[in-house]
Amino acid sequence: MGETAWTGTPVIPHPDARDNDAEKLPWGGRREKLPMRWPFADAVEGFRSKALANKQYDPASTFVWGQMMAVGLIEMLKAIEAAFGADGHDVARAALRKVGDRIATEMIDGVEKPGDLSPAELSSLFASWINEVAYASIENPKVEGDGASFDIHYCPHEDVYGAFDCRVQRYLVEGMIEAARRHWGDGMIDVAFATTIPSGSRTCHFDMFPKGEGSDKWFEYSDRLRDRALKIVDVK
């Protein structure tokens, strides 16, 4: 990737992002501690039994299809913001949040929290399900005391998106967070990002920490991105 993403958004390539050992990290095993479900379960089974069972089918074509849908959503959001300003942005963000909520609800509905999990452990395992299943990523998670963190070593969008484009994924996560808190209570801890691959880092790093009284870091940063987006399209 050069200094401009496929979407036209600026990026800062990191020389080691392509060689950050993603291929050596474990995937999937820790999720067994929290027995959530795959969303789109019937469709997933159809994909496995029809497409993946076909030895001539290249799963990379599914990747290309997914990127096409993703960049189409970026362009749609930018066009809505340019044409309808704050109202357009808010409607689009709410729609993405609704989708994220529904996906997470399918994953956790009827799932009981193991009694021996701390809020940090529960939040970390929930994040692993979101990272690996919903976002098809490869992560390196840690739980330390009452907090947790994870590094994303591979994200399907890392060579297509610019850093500002990642806000679309953020809005989906808003709904996922709301679903988790509704299901397991407000004890689910807050989350904030520190670095991203498109903004010049080797990995995307996220920190998870106890939610402060009257504070919600994930949603607060989303609001700041809203203001930035509307300035870009010069909304008066």
Where in the sequence are the language-model features?
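Phosphate-moiety recognition in structured ligand-binding domains
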Residues: 150
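N-terminal accessory segment detector
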Residues: 2-147, 156-172, 179-203, 207, ...
